[in-house]
């Protein structure tokens, strides 16, 4: 009987040993440019205007090879005047990134049009993630050639209305068209936090515009 009790205790100890074993949880995988990548909302001031001309939804992503010195930026103009709220104008181009300084730059980088554009104000609606077919992809009138950009992301650079810290983004940006014209903007904004109140300034501005 004593032998059976001893064997039972040994078996219980083995069960505890294996069932109580802890496993190290891997840290989330980060991109090589994780200090600058992500989704941002920003006001755009055209040609040095004192008041915002429009609002941009910005997405910065890493390259296919996850290069530490390069990335892609997609800039979507939320102004759908003359277009459609599901058909926004967007451009995408490659830029050089300094991951440590959290800066990015491009000079006359070739522009492509993404097939879809991120609109933060319809994100999650209509079974979507805020992405809809871009205007030119729908109607075939893109007309852009190159873009130049010079900017920086500051970690926790702004305090949001919810009281949280968010990364800030600021850059100058010029878009060139195939007819020889161009548009230049100064852009200032913040990373999307997921808190509704943090976007209230942008929402109110859009509502005032009737967009």
Walk through the language-model features, giving the residues of each.
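Bacterial signal peptide processing site
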Residues: 21-24
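First exposed extracellular module after export/assembly in secreted or surface-exposed proteins
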Residues: 29-211
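Positively charged n-region of N-terminal signal peptides that target proteins for export
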Residues: 1-7
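C-terminal motif of bacterial Sec signal peptides marking the signal peptidase cleavage site
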Residues: 15-19
């Amino acid at each position: 009987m004593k032998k059976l009790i001893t064997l039972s205790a040994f078996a219980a100890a083995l069960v505890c040993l294996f069932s109580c074993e802890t496993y190290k949880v891997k840290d989330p995988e980060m991109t090589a440019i994780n200090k600058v990548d992500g989704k941002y909302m920003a006001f755009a001031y055209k040609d040095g205007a004192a008041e915002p001309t429009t609002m941009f939804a910005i997405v910065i992503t890493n390259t296919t090879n996850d290069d530490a010195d390069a990335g892609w930026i997609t800039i979507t103009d939320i102004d759908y005047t003359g277009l459609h709220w599901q058909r926004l104008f967007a451009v995408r181009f490659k830029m050089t990134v300094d991951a440590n300084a959290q800066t990015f730059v491009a000079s006359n980088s070739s522009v492509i049009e993404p097939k879809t554009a991120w609109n933060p104000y319809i994100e999650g609606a209509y079974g979507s993630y805020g992405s809809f077919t871009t205007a030119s992809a729908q109607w075939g009138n893109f007309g852009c050639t190159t873009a130049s950009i010079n900017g920086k992301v500051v970690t926790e650079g702004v305090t949001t209305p919810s009281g949280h810290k968010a990364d800030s983004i600021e850059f100058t940006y010029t878009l060139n068209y195939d007819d020889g014209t161009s548009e230049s903007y100064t852009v200032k904004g913040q990373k999307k936090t997921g808190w509704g109140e943090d976007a209230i300034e942008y929402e109110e501005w859009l509502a005032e515009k009737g967009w």
